[in-house]
Design a protein with these regions (language model features):
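Helix-loop boundary and gating motifs at the non-cytosolic
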Residues: 6-53, 216-226, 237
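Loop-to-transmembrane helix entry/capping segments in MFS-fold secondary transporters
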Residues: 42-43, 127-137, 234-235, 318-330
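Helix-to-loop junctions at the C-terminal end of transmembrane segments
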Residues: 59-71, 156, 251-263, 349-350
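Structural signature of the two symmetry-related core transmembrane helices
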Residues: 74-88, 266-281, 362
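Paired small-residue
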Residues: 97-105, 290-298
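Intracellular juxtamembrane helix-capping segments at the cytosolic ends
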Residues: 112-125, 305-318
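C-terminal membrane-cytosol helix-exit motif in multi-pass small-molecule transporters
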Residues: 167-186, 371-375
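A late C-terminal transmembrane helix in Major Facilitator Superfamily
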Residues: 320-351
Length: 387
């Protein structure tokens, strides 16, 4: 592929993924706050938010076979059609059980767009620029998220109009991707062993899991956590997600630049430490506006940096036919985190109070940090014994 076509295809994917970020930014706070107005508990709201992650876990084991049978663009076009239709049905059916089903369908469609976009980004990016390109990719998702949250905060929740706006943007996002071509010579390895990837690359797959857990929990439940601090103002509580996303926009660019120059294992440890400390302090300082914005910025940035650094390592370690299966495994573990994050943190908030939002996630982050350091120490010892 010529350099011109490579850059053109990269630009198409980056534009589309920015619009997908807008869709996420509208749907996440809008869905949580809509259910809250129905009188739904935080744990059930979290469970509803986890439906998209559950869909990803269900579909990813079959993803490689589907690509080989229907082609990359066959899968992509199907997902681009289903996504806006499912979103548009949300305000029509005000039934929690139907919402579970619709969010599951949205998750299936979003997974196809998401996974193929990541495969294309990693396949099109050159190694010497991989960290920066993936950082740009993740930052553009966050930029879209900020725009989406701001759009959501301007539309009254009671009207359901935000969902129709989101569906319209989903249609627009299909335009740059619709005429993409399959990557040449890209049959995919169909035997995806998630256990093998977990054992051989625990730090890499663990980074996707912790990112999914923290990202989904904060995006879904931050507006609920924020309500008592903003006098139950729904618009203000939804805007807190924009501050979270601003960190997700800026910090990965810096981390991606560092990832091309410095030791990635140390970077992962530093990121983990920052996330644990800021999450632990968050409930204590949240009623101070300036500190609230600062800490949300840092929390969001550290969470998205798990993703940026993990995806950079993935593209560096896996090439060719195994790239799609490795990427599917990466998203599988991320989605396991997404499934667990909202309902588990929501249940902690129901049991232990609102402040459990930050403290419980800090404990989970600390456990991951210990596992990551231990697994890398074991790996280094094994390599030294071989020498």
């Amino acid at each position: 592929m010529s350099n011109k076509n490579r850059l053109k295809n990269l630009a198409k994917v980056l534009l589309a993924i920015t619009l997908v970020g807008v869709i996420i930014g509208i749907n996440l706070p809008l869905s949580s706050l809509t259910l809250q107005t129905w009188g739904i508990s935080a744990s059930v709201i979290g469970f509803a938010a986890s439906m998209t992650g559950l869909a990803t876990v269900v579909i990813t084991p079959f993803f490689s076979k589907l690509i080989n049978r229907f082609g990359q663009m066959g899968i992509m076009r199907f997902c681009l059609v289903v996504l806006p239709i499912a979103i548009a049905f949300l305000p029509i059916f005000q039934n929690i059980y139907l919402w579970f089903l619709l969010r599951f369908i949205i998750g299936v469609a979003a997974t196809g767009v998401w996974l193929l976009s990541e495969v294309w980004i990693n396949a099109l990016a050159e190694d010497q620029h991989r960290g920066k390109i993936i950082a740009l990719y993740s930052s553009l998702i966050s930029l879209g998220l900020i725009v989406g949250v701001l759009i959501s905060s301007l539309i009254p929740i009671e009207t359901g109009g935000g969902f129709f706006v989101s569906a319209g943007i989903a249609i627009i996002s299909a335009i740059p991707l619709w005429n993409m071509e399959d990557l040449p010579d890209f049959d995919v390895v169909e035997d995806i062993s998630f256990y093998r990837y977990m054992v051989t690359a625990p730090g890499l797959m663990g980074s996707s899991w912790i990112m999914g857990f923290l990202y989904a929990a904060t995006a879904a439940l931050l507006p609920i956590f924020a309500l008592p601090f903003v006098e139950n103002d729904y618009a203000q509580s939804s805007r807190t997600v924009a501050w979270l996303a601003s960190g997700e926009l800026v910090m990965p660019l810096f981390v991606g630049w560092l990832a091309d120059r410095y030791d990635k294992t140390r970077l992962m440890i530093y990121i983990s430490c920052v996330s644990v400390i800021t999450l632990a302090i968050l409930p204590v300082i949240f009623d101070i506006a300036v500190m609230r914005f600062l800490f949300l910025f840092i929390v969001g940035g550290s969470i998205m940096s798990f993703y940026t650094l993990g995806l950079t390592l993935l593209g560096q370690e896996y090439k060719g036919k195994v790239l799609a299966s490795a990427n599917a495994s990466f998203i599988f573990f991320l989605s396991l985190g997404e499934i667990l994050g909202p309902p588990v943190v929501g249940a902690a908030m129901d049991l232990f109070g609102n402040n459990a939002f930050g403290w419980f996630m800090a404990i989970i982050g600390l456990i991951y940090l210990i596992i990551f350091i231990g697994s890398n120490a074991a790996g280094n010892l094994k390599r030294s014994n071989k020498i």
